Amino acid sequence: MEFSVKSGSPEKQRSACIVVGVFEPRRLSPIAEQLDKISDGYISTLLRRGELEGKVGQTLLLHHVPNVLSERILLIGCGKERELDERQYKQVINKTINTLNDTGSMEAVCFLTELHVKGRNTYWKVRQAVETAKETLYTFDQLKSNKIEPRRPLRKMVFNVPTRRELTSGERAISHGLAIAAGIKAAKDLGNMPPNICNPAYLASQARQLADGYGKTTTTRVIGEQQMKELGMNAYLAVGQGSANESLMSVIEYKGSPDADARPIVLVGKGLTFDAGGISIKPADSMDEMKYDMCGAATVYGVMRMAMELNLPLNIVGVLAGCENMVDGRAFRPGDVLTTLSGQTVEVLNTDAEGRLVLCDALTYVERFEPEVVIDVATLTGACVIALGHHLTGLVSNHNPLAHELIGAAEQAGDRAWRLPLGDEFQEQLESNFADMANIGGRPGGAITAGCFLSRFARKYNWAHLDIAGTAWRSGKAKGATGRPVAMLSQFLLNRTGLNGDE
């Protein structure tokens, strides 16, 4: 789908469709008023008849409006004018894209980007429109024998901006939005792939292909079980020893900074391509969704793709910690004591708390990069879902400025996160009689104690942990990976470069 920006008046547009907003109750937006004026009150007359109230998401498609050059006008309800916020704006864009796609409008000029959204500028409105449009049209049908496609799908979208001086900002917003949307799609495609296809070797192959596609700035190396054993990554190895699929850790290095020696930002993604729980086996209900336990790695993959697409002037290392937690006679057991790469020992009380065992060795491994910051991303705890539901990503950090930076990026991107505490009183729950620590700390504060566990392996750098157990995928009729938090981390990186669209 093609996106562009322009600045022009609605009456001069020759297009299959013009999209304008209507506020509640039956109030035309300024652009809709212009169209109403040149059509001699045609639109306002329809509203007075009760054809459209203006509630969020309501639509009315008009054909051959008098004196209007475009074939059709789509009126879209935007709610109350003073209450139009970012969430409602995205809902309006989503409904617009679906309506255009379903009604055969192959191209459209959209004036919704001229609406006032509280606290948001033109760059944000255009970028979010692009990202939302791509999200709305996303399908995962690679494995279906019969693919259903619209007869006349939407192919071109033009976003109008109020003034010509905002064209540059709008064009930058499209560029950023397309790159972020591509990263989100890549993460969703990986997450939605079934575990008989997407195993650790598949993750590694995708990492290699990513490096091959972006030339000299990017390299990938894959660390297998033999090298892990030589390094002493015994916690990581233990998790995968019950699986027929070899554990593989893919390390993607992107060097985009003009200073080749600049310290990198390191992203570490949990990549459990299937998590049966091991000996502490999960219940059968919804176990199929444990293919999504690699969405942390999928996120890192998507963010790396975004950074390469935009040639961000940063050095970034992305780690996809691929593994599979299965049950057989070789599987690790509750009661085992593991010596991690850091030298610290861990008593395994529950084999279904395996993600932190993989991550702890990965977090120690990345010390060699002398990172500026390290951010790990993981579908780590059901406790985080209980605490924050499916709307907010959980965040813990050992560095207040980094935590504030991430929360700010999350708010900017509309991919929200909430910081959880990281205190000594929670660390006490991890005490073990037989090792330096246990791998679980009981039910109370489970998302926090998981973060406390990881913090013990991140003492040598500024670190943050994102628990995406509640936000990485949806269940039910809309089942599928969400691609979160690619948008948040992309915004974080854009902010680091100064290319964040602030005006």
Curated annotation (Swiss-Prot):
Its main location: cytoplasm. PROSITE patterns: CYTOSOL_AP (PS00631). It is found in: Cytoplasm. It comes from the Bacteria. Mn(2+) 1 binds at residues 275, 352, 354. The active site is at 282, 356. One of its GO terms (cellular component) is cytoplasm. Pfam families: Peptidase_M17, Peptidase_M17_N. One of its GO terms (molecular function) is metalloaminopeptidase activity. Its cofactor is Mn(2+). SUPFAM superfamilies: Macro domain-like, Zn-dependent exopeptidases. Mn(2+) 2 binds at residues 270, 275, 293, 354. Its EC number is 3.4.11.1, 3.4.11.10. It catalyses: Release of an N-terminal amino acid, Xaa-|-Yaa-, in which Xaa is preferably Leu, but may be other amino acids including Pro although not Arg or Lys, and Yaa may be Pro. Amino acid amides and methyl esters are also readily hydrolyzed, but rates on arylamides are exceedingly low; Release of an N-terminal amino acid, preferentially leucine, but not glutamic or aspartic acids. Binds 2 manganese ions per subunit. One of its GO terms (biological process) is proteolysis. Keywords: Aminopeptidase, Cytoplasm, Hydrolase, Manganese, Metal-binding, Protease. Belongs to the peptidase M17 family. Presumably involved in the processing and regular turnover of intracellular proteins. Catalyzes the removal of unsubstituted N-terminal amino acids from various peptides. This is Probable cytosol aminopeptidase. The gene is pepA.
